[in-house]
Amino acid sequence: MARIAGVDIPRDKRIEVSLTYIYGVGLTRSQAILAKTGVNPDIRVKDLEDGDLQKLRGALENYTVEGDLRRQEGMALKRLQDIGCLRGRRHRMSLPVRGQRTRTNARTRRGARKTVAGKKK
């Protein structure tokens, strides 16, 4: 397996698809990187030359990927929670953040049902 940006990318897949195994690189960004470096997107990772791998590593240094990106996202969420805005509070309470209804739906975000005992007569 070739190692790019600290990630072992699969050898038998096309380089265009293999780059998407890196957190922060989707198909569009992968295609842009390959176009910029001049690497054929249809070539398999195992057939890449060392020079091509070095070009790809150099091109990926211009983007925020993997641990740095995860850290940035975590800090953005923490900032929202620290300033006490509605979005931060909703994140903290594990509720939908973007205005969706919660009376009936939002099961994924809220988790499994917690049964509350009924009132006795």
From Swiss-Prot:
Located at the top of the head of the 30S subunit, it contacts several helices of the 16S rRNA. In the 70S ribosome it contacts the 23S rRNA (bridge B1a) and protein L5 of the 50S subunit (bridge B1b), connecting the 2 subunits; these bridges are implicated in subunit movement. Contacts the tRNAs in the A and P-sites. GO terms for cellular component: cytosol; small ribosomal subunit. The gene is rpsM. Transmembrane segments: none annotated. Gene3D superfamilies: 1.10.8.50, 30s ribosomal protein s13, domain 2. The keyword tRNA-binding applies. One of its GO terms (molecular function) is rRNA binding. GO terms for biological process: translation. Residues 100-121 have a biased composition (Basic residues). InterPro entries: Rbsml_uS13_C, Ribosomal_uS13, Ribosomal_uS13-like_H2TH, Ribosomal_uS13_bac-type, Ribosomal_uS13_CS. Pfam families: Ribosomal_S13. Keywords: Ribonucleoprotein, Ribosomal protein, RNA-binding, rRNA-binding, tRNA-binding. Belongs to the universal ribosomal protein uS13 family. This is Small ribosomal subunit protein uS13. Residues 97-121 are annotated as: Disordered. The keyword tRNA-binding applies. It comes from the Bacteria.
